[in-house]
């Protein structure tokens, strides 16, 4: 079948040998990984060359791989129930993520060939800059602004890289995994100043893992002296 995903994979591997990190087919979905320096050129070829014809960009997002691959919570071992109940530790190993923390992922659509393709590129954690592809697909405008707003990824060449979901005075990037759930500041209307003001957040940050795992005594046999009512 000429327009099968396997055919797309064959064409990509033949055309971009040396320019892509991998081309992986899983669950019927094709993903390619492109080094940052080849990202724009590969995307341009995917759009313009007849063998590919990806005329539409349908999505772009940022990804934070902080703590990716950790197999368990950093907490005490569960007792009767919990995350680690009935798990044999030899079944898996804890895998530490050693690559860059942030990535940009785009999803492309070729209507003429009925293909979908996922393209991923990692950005330097210290610089956080990726080439903008707005010259190739105008639809990426707000997507790149969203990735900048939520993850702090800068897109070189974007003509209007401003926050799009948070307000102008927002501090930080809320989709980063180390961003506090309670935020950094809270705002309220000050009747004396007759305007909205920002103040340091006054609530305690939530903890996502149990602080204490207590022993479960519900199914333990009671001692004989504990039975017999209340006297």
UniProtKB/Swiss-Prot annotation:
<dbReference type="InterPro" id="IPR010218">
    <property type="entry name" value="NADH_DH_suC"/>
</dbReference>
<keyword id="KW-0472">Membrane</keyword>
<keyword id="KW-1003">Cell membrane</keyword>
<keyword id="KW-0520">NAD</keyword>
<keyword id="KW-0813">Transport</keyword>
<dbReference type="InterPro" id="IPR020396">
    <property type="entry name" value="NADH_UbQ_OxRdtase_CS"/>
</dbReference>
<comment type="function">
    <text>NDH-1 shuttles electrons from NADH, via FMN and iron-sulfur (Fe-S) centers, to quinones in the respiratory chain. The immediate electron acceptor for the enzyme in this species is believed to be ubiquinone. Couples the redox reaction to proton translocation (for every two electrons transferred, four hydrogen ions are translocated across the cytoplasmic membrane), and thus conserves the redox energy in a proton gradient.</text>
</comment>
<dbReference type="GO" id="GO:0005886">
    <property type="term" value="C:plasma membrane"/>
</dbReference>
<dbReference type="InterPro" id="IPR001268">
    <property type="entry name" value="NADH_UbQ_OxRdtase_30kDa_su"/>
</dbReference>
<protein>
    <recommendedName>
        <fullName>NADH-quinone oxidoreductase subunit C</fullName>
        <ecNumber>7.1.1.-</ecNumber>
    </recommendedName>
</protein>
<dbReference type="GO" id="GO:0048038">
    <property type="term" value="F:quinone binding"/>
</dbReference>
<dbReference type="Pfam" id="PF00329">
    <property type="entry name" value="Complex1_30kDa"/>
</dbReference>
<keyword id="KW-0874">Quinone</keyword>
<comment type="subunit">
    <text>NDH-1 is composed of 14 different subunits. Subunits NuoB, C, D, E, F, and G constitute the peripheral sector of the complex.</text>
</comment>
<dbReference type="GO" id="GO:0008137">
    <property type="term" value="F:NADH dehydrogenase (ubiquinone) activity"/>
</dbReference>
<keyword id="KW-1278">Translocase</keyword>
<keyword id="KW-0830">Ubiquinone</keyword>
<dbReference type="InterPro" id="IPR037232">
    <property type="entry name" value="NADH_quin_OxRdtase_su_C/D-like"/>
</dbReference>
<comment type="similarity">
    <text>Belongs to the complex I 30 kDa subunit family.</text>
</comment>
<keyword id="KW-0997">Cell inner membrane</keyword>
<dbReference type="GO" id="GO:0050136">
    <property type="term" value="F:NADH:ubiquinone reductase (non-electrogenic) activity"/>
</dbReference>
């Amino acid at each position: 079948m000429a327009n099968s995903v396997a055919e797309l994979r064959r064409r990509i591997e033949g055309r971009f040998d040396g320019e892509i990190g991998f081309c992986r087919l899983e669950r019927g979905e094709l993903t390619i990984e492109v080094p940052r320096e080849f990202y724009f050129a590969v995307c341009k070829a995917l759009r313009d060359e007849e063998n590919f014809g990806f005329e539409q960009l349908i999505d772009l997002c940022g990804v934070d791989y902080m703590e990716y691959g950790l197999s368990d919570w950093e907490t005490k071992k569960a007792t009767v129930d919990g995350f680690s109940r009935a798990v044999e530790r030899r079944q898996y190993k804890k895998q530490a993520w050693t690559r860059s923390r942030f990535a940009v992922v785009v999803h492309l659509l070729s209507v003429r060939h009925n293909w979908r393709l996922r393209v991923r590129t990692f950005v330097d954690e210290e610089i956080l800059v990726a080439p903008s592809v707005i010259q190739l697909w105008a639809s990426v405008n707000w997507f790149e602004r969203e990735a900048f707003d939520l993850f702090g990824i800068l897109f070189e060449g974007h003509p209007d890289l401003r926050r799009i979901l948070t307000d102008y005075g927002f501090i930080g990037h809320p989709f980063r995994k180390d961003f506090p759930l309670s935020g950094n500041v809270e705002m309220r209307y000050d009747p004396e100043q007759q305007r909205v003001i920002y103040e340091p957040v006054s609530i305690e940050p939530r903890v996502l893992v149990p602080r204490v795992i207590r022993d479960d005594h519900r199914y333990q046999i009671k001692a004989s002296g504990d039975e017999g009512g209340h006297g």
